[in-house]
Amino acid sequence: MIIFMCKQYEHTIAITNRKLVQGDFLEQMQKVIHLHPHAVILREKDLSDKEYEILAEKILEMCRESGVRCFLHSRISVANRLGCRRIHMSIPVLMSMCEEERSQMRKNFQEISVSCHSMEDMDTAVRCGATQIILGTIFETECKKGLKGKGLGFVAEICKACPVPVYAIGGINLKRLPQVMDAGAAGGCMMSGFMRI
């Protein structure tokens, strides 16, 4: 039973949002990490660098103990201080960096994850060194009500053109995961699905 549960999450990426957690965030993350998702992206964009670093140190340790990849979100200096070799970037942040900064990022990180919303974003991300793409928004979500999802055709179009793994985001759950994978995605990202598990 436990092996089956872990297997069903092997193509998922857990995106954190401690504001969705009822109870202790670290306890929730322990539960999530024990499910062995493909990776965790520690988002928590509202925290100061110092607060984020304190939290990241704990989450990175949990992930290391369980053999789960952990990406820090946009905090390159924090990642460098903590020895984390995985970073997740948004396209606007990536575009604001000069070529020298992007080159340094490619040297410092073994995996670079980038959020994309169009073919142009994907091309830019890959050119800048992305090793995986987080593609959204595929289905309508709770956190972005009213924003129409781009659908499975969009996933297929991007996956066909993209030389690196693509993970779909936006309204993804375990029932929809096979649909995005059939469209060519390597897997899917879940936020509320993991924060409320």
Question: Over which residues does each language-model region extend?
Answer:
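Catalytic beta/alpha-barrel core
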Residues: 15-18, 38-51, 60-99, 109-123, ...
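Generic hydrophobic/aromatic pocket-lining and core-packing "Φ" positions
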Residues: 29, 56, 60, 76, ...
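Alpha-helix-loop-beta-strand connector modules within alpha/beta enzyme cores
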Residues: 53-72, 100-118, 148-173
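Catalytic cores of alpha/beta
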Residues: 70-85, 117-129, 161-162, 166-167, ...
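Glycine-rich phosphate-binding active-site loops on the catalytic face of alpha/beta enzymes
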Residues: 14, 90-99, 134-146, 172-197
